[in-house]
Swiss-Prot record:
Entry function: Part of the multicomponent 3-phenylpropionate dioxygenase. Converts 3-phenylpropionic acid (PP) and cinnamic acid (CI) into 3-phenylpropionate-dihydrodiol (PP-dihydrodiol) and cinnamic acid-dihydrodiol (CI-dihydrodiol), respectively.
Organism of this sequence: Shigella sonnei (strain Ss046)
Protein name: 3-phenylpropionate/cinnamic acid dioxygenase subunit beta
PANTHER family given in the database record: 3-PHENYLPROPIONATE_CINNAMIC ACID DIOXYGENASE SUBUNIT BETA, BLR3401 PROTEIN
Oxidoreductase found in the keyword field: yes
A Pfam family assignment: Ring_hydroxyl_B
Length: 172
């Protein structure tokens, strides 16, 4: 495991992630895009339940991408939300992003830090539609020269093997 970061650095990176989550909850998607590095990789794969005997052998069942997005693709998703023609978001979802168990370590790349957080994303829409997404995120954040931060990678791992929501139009 790589070296853990100082308490001060841990606090600053955590605050960046909390701010980023609040931008998503407040539907400030253009501001959220500004928090992303131009080289962002935003990914989520399907979760497959592997048998214990297979896991012991190191055998992983095949998965497929749910998201494998670049910044351009994320910009297009947001532009679509802004048109009012994204029917999956009419009326708009109300979300709450909760992150915890934040573990931050250095990487081999200067000013890039690996972050592991557990998350709960609550989504409410219409009168009775509620969905909880629970899992772990593996992020990489980059410190800029002006001491600001950018999200470089986000790999979203859902605990659920079956997604029961009508769609996945929310951002994690």
């Amino acid at each position: 495991m790589s070296a853990q970061v100082s308490l001060e650095l841990h606090h600053r990176i955590s605050q960046f992630l909390f701010h980023e989550a609040s931008l998503l909850d407040d539907w400030k998607f253009r501001d959220w895009l500004e928090q992303l590095d131009k080289e962002i990789r935003y990914t989520m794969r399907t979760t497959v339940n592997a048998q214990t005997r297979d896991r012991r052998k190191g055998v992983q069942p095949p998965t497929t991408w749910i998201f494998n997005d670049t910044k351009d693709q994320l910009e297009r998703r947001i532009a679509r939300l802004e048109t009012g023609m994204a029917w999956a978001e009419e009326p708009p979802s109300r979300t709450r992003h909760l992150i915890s168990n934040c573990q931050i370590s250095e990487t081999d790349i200067p000013n890039v830090f690996a972050v592991r957080v557990n998350y709960l994303l609550y989504r409410a829409q219409k009168e009775r539609d509620e969905t909880f997404y629970v899992g772990t995120r593996f992020d990489k954040v980059r410190r800029l020269e002006d001491d600001n931060w950018r999200l470089l990678e986000r790999d979203i791992v859902l605990d659920q093997a079956v997604i029961t929501s009508h769609n996945l139009s929310v951002l994690f």
